[in-house]
């Protein structure tokens, strides 16, 4: 074997790199990975770059330059190990020709506020990038590329995780245009020009990568179910790929929880209803509220339950950051709404203003873990007594 080059992008990439550096201590390797600020883990032989998430910054571009430089001019006997996890879309940025970092920031902000699913956002991002949608693997040719993936997307499609820098793109320019039109996205002129002219064309050729899934939402839910069963609870996994507006999903789950509590359907307590996936929050331009999709889901769930006895719930992002706040998520119980009102918070008003973080902070029911150094999407647990 020739050279071994380690590259990566995502909230878990530094932790993955440190583990690989330790396990392969007898292999001559080098490389560079990028992770979110505050998520770095020391690695002796692999350079760690920190950048901004969910909106990219100068270091996101610097990371792309360094990673592209690391894989250029490799030969057929060389091996590239790509460590990919959620968050890589904003951490690894190489704007399409004619676009700037400012353009990419504007695109990301428009996507994040639109209510689009993660799959839809990534379909647009791939068409505006010189590195996403398999282009990084093309740049590494003819070296062998092995991609180790931690999934944070519904359905675990590796082409969607971090916008698939080393995985063939199965979406098209027409898909991206349709998404922009459907969500009425206002994109900068340079991005509009790229889409109008057929998308980024930085690389051509077949994408070749051996992809291995090493962690996923379904694995996390299975582990949670095992812990629940060991503690005398009947676990029911409702799905690992749930999507939709956070407040709408919260309302639906309130109905499911009430059915379980009062009728024993789909399960009789003591039990726990588990689910994963990634909801979304559509934000009006003038929104000043604070909160992420997990706290908004929980506030909607609490309003739907309206103080029902014997039901508690927790929802959080497994990376430790719900949206852009310092909390992973929050938790609720039968007295949550009463405690909010006692603290001067009107729950329905807070939900309408997308201010769920403030509501849960007022009653000290935020869940704060700090960076977990992994990312397998959100996890929701509703306990039925």
From Swiss-Prot:
Reactions this protein catalyses: (R)-glycerate + NAD(+) = 3-hydroxypyruvate + NADH + H(+); (R)-glycerate + NADP(+) = 3-hydroxypyruvate + NADPH + H(+)
Intrachain S-S bonds: none
Pathway: Carbohydrate acid metabolism; tartrate degradation; 3-hydroxypyruvate from D-glycerate: step 1/1
Keywords: NADP, Oxidoreductase, Plasmid
GO cellular component: cytoplasm
GO molecular function: glycerate kinase activity; hydroxypyruvate reductase (NADH) activity; hydroxypyruvate reductase (NADPH) activity
InterPro entries hit by this protein: GK-like_C_sf, GK_N_sf, MOFRL, MOFRL_assoc_dom, MOFRL_protein
Induction details: By tartrate.
EC number: 1.1.1.81
Oxidoreductase in keyword set: yes
The protein's role, per its UniProt record: Degrades an unidentified toxic product from the first step of tartrate degradation.
Protein name: Putative hydroxypyruvate reductase
Species: Agrobacterium vitis (Rhizobium vitis)
Lineage, highest ranks first: Bacteria, Pseudomonadati, Pseudomonadota, Alphaproteobacteria, Hyphomicrobiales
């Amino acid at each position: 074997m020739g050279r071994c080059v380690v590259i990566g992008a995502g909230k878990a990439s530094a932790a993955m790199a440190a583990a690989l550096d330790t396990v392969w201590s007898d292999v001559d390797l080098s490389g560079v990975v990028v992770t979110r600020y505050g998520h770095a883990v020391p690695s002796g032989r692999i350079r760690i770059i920190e950048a901004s998430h969910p909106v990219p910054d100068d270091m996101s571009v610097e990371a792309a330059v360094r990673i592209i430089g690391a894989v250029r001019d490799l030969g057929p006997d060389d091996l590239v190990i790509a460590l990919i996890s959620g968050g890589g879309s904003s951490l690894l940025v190489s704007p399409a020709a004619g676009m700037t970092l400012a353009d990419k920031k504007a695109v990301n902000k428009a996507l994040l506020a639109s209510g689009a699913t993660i799959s839809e956002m990534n379909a647009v991002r791939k068409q505006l990038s010189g590195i996403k949608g398999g282009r990084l693997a093309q740049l590494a040719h003819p070296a062998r590329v092995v991609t180790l993936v931690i999934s944070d997307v519904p359905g675990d499609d590796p082409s969607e995780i971090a916008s698939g820098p080393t995985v063939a793109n199965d979406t098209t320019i027409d898909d991206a245009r349709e998404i922009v039109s459907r969500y009425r996205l206002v994109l900068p002129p340079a991005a509009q020009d790229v889409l109008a002219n057929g998308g980024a064309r930085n690389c051509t050729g077949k994408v070749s990568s051996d992809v291995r899934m090493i962690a996923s939402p379904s694995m996390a839910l299975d582990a949670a179910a095992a812990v629940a069963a060991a503690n005398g609870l009947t676990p029911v996994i409702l799905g690992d790929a749930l999507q939709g507006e956070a407040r709408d999903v919260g309302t639906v789950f309130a109905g499911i929880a009430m059915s379980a509590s009062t009728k024993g359907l789909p399960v009789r307590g003591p039990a726990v209803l588990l689910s994963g996936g990634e909801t979304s929050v559509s934000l009006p331009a003038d929104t000043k509220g604070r909160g992420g999709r997990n706290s908004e889901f929980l506030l909607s769930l609490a309003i739907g339950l309206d103080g029902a006895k014997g039901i508690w719930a927790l929802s959080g992002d497994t990376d430790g950051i719900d949206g852009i706040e310092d909390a992973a998520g929050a938790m609720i119980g039968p007295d949550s709404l009463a405690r909010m009102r006692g603290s001067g918070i009107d729950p329905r008003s807070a939900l309408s203003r997308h201010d769920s973080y403030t509501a849960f902070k007022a009653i000290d029911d935020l869940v704060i873990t700090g960076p977990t150094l992994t990312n397998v999407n959100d996890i929701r647990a509703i306990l039925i007594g």
